Amino acid sequence: VNIDAAVLAEIRQITIALARELGVVGLMNLQFALQGRDLYVLEVNPRASRTVPFVAKAIGLPVAKIAARVAAGERLAALGVREIIPPHVAVKVPVFPFAKFAGVDTILGPEMRSTGEVMGIADDFGAAFHKGQLAAGVRLPDAGAVFISVRDEDKDLVLPVVAGLIALGFTVTATRGTAAAIRAAGHPCQVVNKVKEGRPHVVDALVNREIVLVINTTIGAQAIRDSFSIRRTALTQRIPYFTTISGGLAAAHAIEAARAGDPVMAPRALQDYHHALSDGPTPPRRPGYRQGLT
């Protein structure tokens, strides 16, 4: 969705080269990291992963079964297997157990903290992300006040998110530093106190249901401790929260898609998506979420 064609082509070439060099027959799991324009291979495992059933559902092929037959000596050509690039978008959304453990911080790091995954599938990214959030038990708001507090290096990056949410009719509330950056960019923004600045503060606003969405990025041990109560209160109040800029922007696209209603958000059988892969022209895809709201 947000990776350009040249990088995707490079990923495909690297994958093919590694599979041939390592002599893997069957399934192979690769993990890539993209930093700017630099592509890194994190690991290669000659085995299946949890992504296999996700991919199988997304493209309508029994990937594990095909891999087993290939490992047993059959050839892909004889099985009639071809590469499928679906016109729809499938989003894998993690499910976290934070609500079951009192006092646990919801901030994410390099370690795995999810205990499950769900799929959202639609003709565009925003609708797919929205469906995935619903499946994970998260209901994105349609109107209200959004609280934003981001680290210094994210203050410019969050501006497209702010612009998109304001265009959708939301009001924006922020801590002083973030509010200054938002106002400097020409967007209206209300100021709310941090907890340490005295009441009424942001946690009071969350408890009073004055805020419907939280976007909070932070760095450093002290900043993480200071913002813990924000994340935890949002969780206990069942207020959607995102701890990355990309997550906030994805949420804005999802809300925009939900506003469109049917047919964008209408339930659709998985078999209908699979049937469309081999029948009829490929429909145009809406812009990826890094290209701005449409």
What is the predicted role of each segment?
Residues 147, 169-181:
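Short internal beta-strands
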Residues 193-194, 202-294:
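Peripheral docking tails and interdomain loops at the edges
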Residues 134-146, 165-167, 205-211:
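Glycine-rich phosphate/diphosphate-binding loops that line cofactor/substrate pockets in enzymes
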Residues 161-167, 179, 183, 235:
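Surface-exposed amphipathic alpha-helices with a cationic face
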Residues 1-142:
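ATP-dependent carboxylate activation and anion-phosphoryl transfer catalytic cores
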Residues 47, 152-153, 218-222:
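Short glycine-rich anion-binding loops that position phosphate/pyrophosphate groups of nucleotides
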